[in-house]
Amino acid sequence: LYYEIHITTLIKQSSHHLEIPERIGAWIGRAGLKDEALKQTHYDKDYKHYTFGSPFPREKEGVYKQGRVYVITIHSSVELTLRRISAALQALQEDEYFQFIAASPVQSKKLTHITELTTVTPAIVTIEGKPWVPDLSVELLLQRIHANAEKKYNHLYPDQPVRLEQPFVEGIQVLNHKPIALAYKGRKLLGNKLRLLVREDEYSQKLASVVLGSGAAEKNSILGAGFCIAKGLE
C-alpha cells in the first residue's frame, strides 16, 4: 500500500528538466518548515518516506516554461505525510519558482502483486562516496537498492523488522546508455533509470511496496530521485 497526491502548480521561472527536481524538493522542504512534524524530520536527517515525479506534461525541448501550469505527483508510504505536505504547500503558496494552484485528495494505491518497478526519475546510488555508474558491478547496485529498501521498511515498521536472505529484486536493467546528471547544490549527481524485476515472496512484495511509496535508493525527497511506477496485478 502506498499513497499519492497531485499538486497543480504554475511555474514562475523557466527551468531545465535536470534542474527542476532540486527546485521542487526545495519548495516542498521550505513548505515543510511550516509544519512541526515535517520540520522535525527535516532536522532528524531520517528517511522522509516521500518522493516526487517530474512535472507533467513533459516538455519535448527539456525546459519547463515560465507561466505554464504543470502537475507534480508525490508518493509516500505514509498517508499523513502527504496530508501534511498538501496543507504546508497551501500555507506557503509560492516561492521564487512555483505558485501553488491546487492539491488533489490523498489516494491510497494497492497492487496485490508487483512484478516490476521502473524508476521514472534517475535512481541515485553512491558507493564509497561516488555514484554507481554502468561500468561498476550490477550485483553491487542490486545489493545497495535492496539494503536501502530494507532500511526504509524497518524504519517504517520497527516492530516487524525484515531481513531477507536474498535481494527483493531478482533482475535489474539499466535503461540509459550513460548516467543522467541532476543538479544539486551547485554540482551534479549522477543517477540511472532502472527496471527492477521483483520476486514473488511476501517480504519482497512488502519491500517493493515501500519503494513505490518512499522511492528507490537515495535523495528521494530532496531530488525526487528513484520515483517509481509499477507493473502488477490490481
Could you say what each language-model-derived stretch is?
Residues L1-E234:
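RNA-interacting cores
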